Amino acid sequence: MAAGTGLLATSLSSCAGPPMLEASVIDHRITVPLSAFVGSDFQIIQPEGFLFDIGLVKGADGKFQAFVLECTHASTQLTPAGDGYTCPEHGSTFDIKGKVTRGPAQLPLRQLQTGVSSDTVTIYLR
């Protein structure tokens, strides 16, 4: 592994719903192996020491988008629900791409920059 990249733990959540991957954060980056997307276009990343999970989505075009799963209304951890995320605090919902589908939230989820190499996706937390 190159210096300055995050290490992804191999443990997957056994609960129903999208896979959840625990990740180390190094130099404000997380590295996810592309092999994590075999059979799934969506992963929940649980960054070590980070307040909120990250939704990592692989689009039909093969591009990746990462969103901080923090409600933009109540600053609450969102939970995966159907084809998006729900805020347990006041019921705001967001689609898989972070767009508000039901308020009271009005702003989309914060998107994080991603980069792809031959075998990994890097999520930049800054």
Question: Locations of the language-model features?
Answer:
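N-terminal export signals
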Residues: 1-16
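N-terminal pre-ligand scaffold of iron-sulfur
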Residues: 15-81, 108-126
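Short Pro/Gly-enriched beta-strand edge/turn motifs at strand-loop
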Residues: 36-39, 93-99
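Structural motif
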Residues: 47-49, 89, 96
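Surface loops and adjacent helix of pleckstrin homology
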Residues: 69, 90, 97-99, 126
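Short Cys/His-rich "knuckle" micro-motifs
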Residues: 78-82, 95-98
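Short cysteine/histidine-rich metal-coordination sites, predominantly Zn2+-binding motifs
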Residues: 85-91, 101-110
